[in-house]
Amino acid sequence: MFRPILRLWLLIFVPFAILPFTLLSGNVVPSTALWGHAVFHLIYLPILVVGWWALWRFVREPSNLALRVIAALILLCQTSGLLGHAGELVSVVQRGFFSAPHSIFSENPHLFFAHFGLWGIVASEVLLLILTATAAVQRLLRRPPSATVGQASTSA
């Protein structure tokens, strides 16, 4: 059960932690270079699609209802993130893509889709933590109680 969850971490959490830091924060790509934002959309959209596909497979996989429900909620949030991210990309392409003006960040279509996508992605990150904790607790509860060393049954 932990291999599919590890796959979800690699497809959902890791790209969201690395890509904004490298392309949007100004630490690697200068914050004045708006092409970093467009490249972020181009790279992150296929990652979201692959993560959505992995979630779809995960929802059908576990026999545990709690894990299926949490994974279905993550799938719903990832769908919101995917649609919001695609909407952002479309609004950036309409305004000039790599040469889009800085004012695009305050314009309604980009802003709407940015909020729509960001909150879906953040909610899926939180739900991924909950999914992992739930799977870990259920794994601990399924373990058979081990016999302690040194206890002997006494018969009187």
Regions found by a protein language model. Give the residues of each.
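Loop-to-transmembrane helix junctions at the membrane interface
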Residues: 51-89
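Alpha-helical transmembrane segments of integral membrane proteins
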Residues: 4-7, 35-45, 65-75, 112-126
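Alpha-helical and His/Cys-centered functional microenvironments
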Residues: 24, 28, 41, 45, ...
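N-terminal signal-anchor transmembrane alpha-helix
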Residues: 1-47
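Alpha-helical membrane-associated segments of multi-pass integral membrane proteins
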Residues: 4-13, 94-144
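Cytosolic juxtamembrane helix at the C-terminal end of the final transmembrane segment
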Residues: 2, 55-63, 126-156
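Interfacial non-cytosolic loop connecting adjacent transmembrane helices
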Residues: 26-40, 81-119
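Membrane-embedded alpha-helical transmembrane segments of multi-pass integral membrane proteins
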Residues: 12-19, 40-43, 47-50, 77-87, ...
